[in-house]
């Protein structure tokens, strides 16, 4: 994929930050010394971590240089490092690994989650939030359009960028043998959006990227036009003219056994 667009991502920063706030609220570690914000993006989650744990040694990691540049501008005193989660390993065992809306882009969750738990210091916490929306109309429509003849060749592998999440039970069974506490829950947000275009703009910065990046400008415009029409049909106007954009997310907080 092309690099991420921080400006586009930040248009809905309040809505994107809310899950990070709610994830962090369930982290009970009293004083983590070493914290890693894994997939820190533009630093919105890193800022929350810094505010709650100002005495910790905090580092942000992401594979997008554009997002890291935005994060460094936001928090010039925090070290941000370009790295790939798939092969990342800490030099010091973290007391908290915080991964807000990042691990859904990494394949092989059975091995990944076990590896991250092993990276933690004894008593350390793995806190994860992941969109669980591949079965929502927003993402079903991406795949349906990609299968049509106009875009099929260019988008044959677009849906492969994100694998479906494991079941809640599977994540629990992965983590429980290594943990003294596992807290796992779903939240289905209903974002109040002013227009169809607002929903599409939200998705352009994240879920739509694998479907838009491979296309030429002409094909991209045609895909977006068709997608916007379908989104308008799937997310109809409510009584006040707004549209409710459903966005389920999975939250996991697992504390490694001391």
From Swiss-Prot:
GO terms for biological process: methylation. It catalyses: trans-aconitate + S-adenosyl-L-methionine = (E)-3-(methoxycarbonyl)pent-2-enedioate + S-adenosyl-L-homocysteine. HAMAP family: Tran_acon_Me_trans. Pfam families: Methyltransf_25. It is found in: Cytoplasm. Catalyzes the S-adenosylmethionine monomethyl esterification of trans-aconitate. SUPFAM superfamilies: S-adenosyl-L-methionine-dependent methyltransferases. GO terms for cellular component: cytoplasm. NCBIfam families: PRK01683.1. CDD domains: AdoMet_MTases. This is Trans-aconitate 2-methyltransferase. Gene3D superfamilies: S-adenosyl-L-methionine-dependent methyltransferases, Vaccinia Virus protein VP39. The gene is tam. One of its GO terms (molecular function) is trans-aconitate 2-methyltransferase activity. The keyword Methyltransferase applies. Belongs to the methyltransferase superfamily. Tam family. Its EC number is 2.1.1.144. It comes from Acidovorax ebreus (strain TPSY) (Diaphorobacter sp. (strain TPSY)).
């Amino acid at each position: 994929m092309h690099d991420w667009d921080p400006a586009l991502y930040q248009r809905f920063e309040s809505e994107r930050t809310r899950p990070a706030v709610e994830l962090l609220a369930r982290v009970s570690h009293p004083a983590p010394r070493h914290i890693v914000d894994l997939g820190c993006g533009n630093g919105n989650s890193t800022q929350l971590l810094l505010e709650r744990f100002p005495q910790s040694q905090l580092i942000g990691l992401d594979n997008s240089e554009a997002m890291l540049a935005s994060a460094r501008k936001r928090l010039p005193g925090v070290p941000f490092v370009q790295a790939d989660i798939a092969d990342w390993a800490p030099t010091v065992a973290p007391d908290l690994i915080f991964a807000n809306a990042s691990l859904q882009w990494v394949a092989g969750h059975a091995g990944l989650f076990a590896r991250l738990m092993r990276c933690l210091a004894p008593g350390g916490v793995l806190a994860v939030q992941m969109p669980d929306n591949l079965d929502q109309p927003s993402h079903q429509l991406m795949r349906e359009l990609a299968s049509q003849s106009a875009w099929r060749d260019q988008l044959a592998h677009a849906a492969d960028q994100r694998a479906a999440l494991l079941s809640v039970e599977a994540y629990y069974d992965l983590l429980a043998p290594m943990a003294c506490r596992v807290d796992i829950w779903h939240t289905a947000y209903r974002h109040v959006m002013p227009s169809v275009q607002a929903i599409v703009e939200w998705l352009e910065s994240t879920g739509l990227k694998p479907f838009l990046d491979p296309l030429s400008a002409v094909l991209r415009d045609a895909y977006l036009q068709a997608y916007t029409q379908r989104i308008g049909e799937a997310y109809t106007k409510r009584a006040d003219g707004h549209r409710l954009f459903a966005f389920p997310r999975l939250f996991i907080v697992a504390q490694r056994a001391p």
